[in-house]
């Protein structure tokens, strides 16, 4: 029974934490992602993606700020359209905390050696020569699924959505926020 409750909290902590508490805890994770990502060569340059390249701490935090602002503002507008009653702070807190799983990828950057980009262009199979890079690619999928699950639950709990309304609102909101983040990152950084 205890394992079920721990798993439940890992995929939906928002039944226990939301608002300012979730926002504060989420900011701790985001700050760690920024510092660790910058030093390990992991850039979170989109709402739900990351790439391996050298960045400064300042760039890391600009990327994260744009990502988070895009996600929260688009989901807020989405909430205004499809929900009758919700608090912005709950959405802000839960969406910020939903980024937490990406900290695992930032940490994994310390142990990953990315193949040279020129070598990849000549022979794409060179990526399989780096075991750590292959492990990183494999780890990325469950981390992204976990984070997206948290985002869905954040929208569900914060805005009181369910069913097809939740599904459509989330998918549209996520893709719009990713597009906005990519455009802003391209022009700002």
Where do the protein language model's features map onto the residues?
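Juxtamembrane loop-helix boundary motifs flanking transmembrane segments in multi-pass membrane proteins
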Residues: 2-6, 45, 49-57, 83, ...
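Membrane-interface helix-boundary motifs at transmembrane edges
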Residues: 14-17, 80-91, 156-164
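Alpha-helical transmembrane segments with an aromatic anchor "belt"
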Residues: 51-113
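Central hydrophobic cores of alpha-helical transmembrane segments
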Residues: 94-95, 165-176
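Juxtamembrane boundary at the C-terminal end of a transmembrane helix
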Residues: 178-189
